Amino acid sequence: MSPSNTLPSLPSIGAIAVLSYLLFVRLTRWRVYNHVHRKYAHRIADFDTLTLAEAQDITHAAMLWDVPSIVMNSMSFAIVRTYAFPAMSRILCGTKELQPDTVSRRYIDTAILVATYSVCPFRTKGPPSEFYVAANGTDEDAAAADPRAYLAIARMNWLHEHYPIKNDDFLVTLAFLIFLPVRWAERFGWRTLSPLEVHARFVFWKHIGELMHIRDIPDSAVELEVWAEEYEARHMTPADTNHILAEGMLTELASSVPSFARGLFRRLVICVMGERMRIAMKLPVQPPAVHALLDIGAALVRFAGRHLFPPRLHAYCAVSVKPVPIPKGDNEPTRMHPLMKVTKPWYLPRTTGMWRVLEKLMLALGLRSIDDVPAPKYDDKGYRLEEIGPVRWKTVGHALVMQKAGEMMGCPVQGVWAQPSTKIT
């Protein structure tokens, strides 16, 4: 028998490789989900005993591992959804902060604050999340001394105090942040969020709401979802200010895609909104073909994510939770850089070495815009949590933010995070 008859053919080898890969995906795709649900199996029968630390750890399965892009984008869209309430759109239009040259900063600031208190530990019963432990070790005392979650909430509260936002507006925003990721995972994700994960989101975000001093938060996720639906039906109504913000938002989002695709992208975003939000924002009805295209695209994304893509090797987060280096000089406060980029390179460091050479070459060839390059105007040295917000407030409120964060923690903010304030307002 000749050797050619004993060796498998190339098509056979290819088929074996493809089948082996698909089997690998099938065997590993649910790795994180199964791990979390085995770890907290004792809580599934009794949701009421779920602690804050456990809830935060559970939320990380979807947010950082399984469907991070869907969770992150849906939470951004949850904020955008508030633009369809005239009471809130009037406030936002009055701030002048959603102008073309500043809107990207507002998006990254919001992402940094939300990501920080979503992944950094709180001083509560139980160990920190596995994600935090992987970056910082198992020292629970060190985790308890990490003030970043409280600094992010304190700064967010300080910013909100400058606007006449009503309690119900805060509460419906909280509901959007809890439930929109659940709905988007059902529509676009390769898996849905389990009842345990939904309850964990409620437990975690209810605590955030309490730290924000939101009153009358319902005692269950079901009650909050029902309340939010009724509130939205009554108050999400058409207004010119809604439309102004919608146009600005669509322009900002479309700027991240090639120019030839922006028209279609805009139509797809409007379809994602749903009819109530579209009407409130006074945007045009979209053709059935565009809705069908969105549904087909969502189905393909779900199929590919479930059957063709292996699980992530590393968690994805907009911010780092690793220990930060001690500043070189007494007058150089510790700063951080985000791990994500919006349409402008806010807070990103300048490139060095060969990357810097490549960047200059791309600029010279016109392959990259100067607006995409980190620079002082984009705060390329990084951010500090007590400085987050509009440029005009970058240097104010620091001492009060430190004070409020310390009060929430039960001890003063210390170490590299503690910095003297320039003003108290």
Locations of regions flagged by a protein language model:
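Mature, function-bearing regions of proteins
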Residues: 2-425
